[in-house]
Amino acid sequence: MIDALYILIVALVIYKTAQFVHRKSLEKKHHCQPVKQIPLVSILSGLGFDMFFKDTAEMTKNGGLHKKLQQMLESLQTTTFRSRMLTGSQIVTMEPENERTMCSSAHMKDWTIGYRPFALKPLLGDGIFSSEGESWKHSRIMLRPIFAKEHIKQITAMEPYMLLLIEIIKSSSANEGPVDLQPLFHAFTIDYASDFLFGESCDVLKENLGGKSTSGMDAQVKRDFASVFNDVQNYLTKRMMLGPLAFLVSSKDFHDGIKKQHEFVSYFVQKAISMSDEELNDESKNYVFLYQLAKQTKDAKVLQDELLSILLAGRNTTASLLSFLFFELSHHENVWTTLKEVVDQSFPDVESITFETIQNCDYLRWCLFESLRVNPSVPFNSRTANKDTILPRGGGEDCSHPILVKKGDQVLFPLYASNRQEKYFGRKPEEFIPERWRDLPKTGGPAFMPFSTGPRMCLGQQFALIEASYVTIRLVQTFSKLKSHSLEYAPKRLVAATIRLIDGCFVSFE
């Protein structure tokens, strides 16, 4: 027994010594410099307990984690720092070059998406956002053609939902005064996303007007799906924060919500896999995402996992973008006036709104990009080191030297802080100024990554931008004036899977 323990201790010492020598060799080879460290104020902070619980509280209750990280970077006068978390060591960096390195195809083997698969698996299974390696590659190959440009061009399918949205806004404005656009944008995006994905809408907007669903699906199943959508996402956000302790987030409400999500999607999946190839081809003429996917596989679980993954991403990011865009427009009358003039000239009627005319409207793109810069829909990106590796910047007093990232370290990239760097985005980076994009590259430059970058970059990027553009154009076409009814300008942001306005987006149109 003693001999075995002695051998184990010796082996551990040898392993740790070899690891130390290897890391020192890496640091010397790449001229690495140390990263600034969050000062330890207690035993708890040394173990990571205080940072972990403070971060969780900030994210799930106060919505201030994005600001907290920015303030920490500013107070340390750095672009990168290291801290202890309950789940291990964490590096926070707002260096765009580090983000691009982590996400590049050349370094994919150096990094994993951490505990994300474990956290998201109850809802998304092995879908594209919760898988890695060969499983992820297969998902990517299968889904990429469905997001081809010619399919995104079919934007006229949005108009029926746009008419419902406009009717609700007009009705609410006439009867109740200010209207909260945030839940309406979430209703619009889930209606359109479900139509695009399944060929049938959730009909949330229609029910908002007192109408009834005309589809073959049980109306209560639709209502259940839409009503628990946000609750399930909030649970998943907490699971991602907890990392290896994600199993602690488990309740009857959570599992009931998952069941309702799966039940909704299963209805459409079973309908698709029961079709013959000839029937699928016939149904695909109107372009339904599910039917395109079912041509490649009839595996019910694969279809369900991928559909829920796309729905989760597509609905939230676009609704968040629209909510914050109109919040900013309602507080910047000069921007609304300019956008109104541009839209009236470029899009005289509904028929003039095409994929090509949207792509050619620079000022509209500036407004969308500026909203994504100031209020990124997904405020964080992260990776976990799969082995000892190097990031190109963040070390030393001037943060210009490479840094060593140890195996198991989590690297967090806060877009909220990165997007507020004057050296990349010009003067007054805290302010909403669409005109700044006149002097920036058309794609935003290497520091602008609202949809991530590299092989895992969002497949639905163009789809989301076209959808947000269409909604914006139609509302600007319909109304001449926009006025804010928010009590204060600085938006209070709630960070979950995406960011939301804590106090909503209360406006009035004329």
Curated annotation (Swiss-Prot):
Keywords: Heme, Iron, Membrane, Metal-binding, Monooxygenase, Oxidoreductase
Record Gene3D superfamilies: Cytochrome P450
Database matches in InterPro entries: Cyt_P450, Cyt_P450_CS, Cyt_P450_E_CYP52_ascomycetes, Cyt_P450_E_CYP52_fungi, Cyt_P450_E_grp-II, Cyt_P450_sf
One family name in Pfam for this protein: p450
Binding-site residues, heme: 458
Places the protein is found: Membrane
Highest taxon in the source lineage: Eukaryota
Cofactor(s) the protein needs: heme
Cellular component aspect of the GO annotation: membrane
Membrane-crossing segments per the record: none
PROSITE patterns (alphabetical): CYTOCHROME_P450
Induction line: By various alkanes.
Annotated SUPFAM superfamilies: Cytochrome P450
Catalytic activity, EC: 1.14.14.-
GO molecular function: heme binding; iron ion binding; oxidoreductase activity, acting on paired donors, with incorporation or reduction of molecular oxygen, reduced flavin or flavoprotein as one donor, and incorporation of one atom of oxygen
Enzyme class, first EC level, given as a word: oxidoreductase
Similarity comment: Belongs to the cytochrome P450 family.
Role according to the record: Together with an NADPH cytochrome P450 the enzyme system catalyzes the terminal hydroxylation as the first step in the assimilation of alkanes and fatty acids.
Name the UniProt record assigns to this protein: Cytochrome P450 52C2
Organism whose genome encodes this protein: Candida maltosa (Yeast)
Upper taxonomic lineage: Eukaryota, Fungi, Dikarya, Ascomycota, Saccharomycotina
